[in-house]
Amino acid sequence: MTSWFLFFNNHATAQELQAKITINHNQIQGTDKSVFENLQQTLEQFVNERQWTNLKFQKNERIVCNFNITVTKYDQSSNAFTCTALIQANRPVYNSAYTSTLFNIKDADFNFEFAQFDQIEFNEENIDNQLTALFGYYAYLIIGLNLDSFAPMGGEDILQRCMNLTNNAQNLSFTGWKAFENSKNRFAIINDYLDGGMKPFRQLQYDYYRTGLDEMANSPERGRTNITTALQNDLKKAHEDKPMSMLPQIWTDYKKDE
């Protein structure tokens, strides 16, 4: 852990995330736009003002993330939203202005119910609301991935909370939470990530970011060498140990331009 990323100090804030939420409702005609505006404002407030963990982040250390939600269907009578979402999180690179993509995935079943001016509540031990479950899941996943990139397996506790939330969401009548539903749903992502066979993939997060990208400012040659080694060792072993997991392919897809 570096001196620029300290969790406990007197000047730190509680909030971990700095999320921008975009609601694209161009496909929905004849509906008062205010419901979408209220949804966007409610969600940004919920994600950004909540303390998700007991960790302390400096304001400039908060994890920048984006939720781009596209509404494909809206039923005003039942307050049901049918959506897809692109979720992305970024990580700063030490001693540079560069940011690297930490996480990027499309959730094709980002469906929920929301009535205008709803006050949304979240209790991770009692998951009874799809909307808060979705954002709780991605909040814990993003924070856990971020911690893994600063210390080997550093996000274990937070990622276990993500897994617990997923298990507690099994009774929700929405797609995406069930085991074996498909290989890229929310259950599959967190279950695979915590699987013992994916430890090399988790080690990759640390080796790629902390010993690779973060080292580039001090020694570009050493940084590039460490990145190459991480890809050749960690990524290759993760694929060999758990060939059916989609995680290495998802990671490679959003890293290919880097």
Q: What are the functions of these language-model segments?
A:
Residues 1-17:
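Bacterial Sec-dependent N-terminal signal peptides
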Residues 52-55, 151, 240:
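Short, flexible helix-adjacent loops and helix caps
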Residues 77-188:
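Acidic/His-rich structured neighborhood in mature extracellular/periplasmic domains
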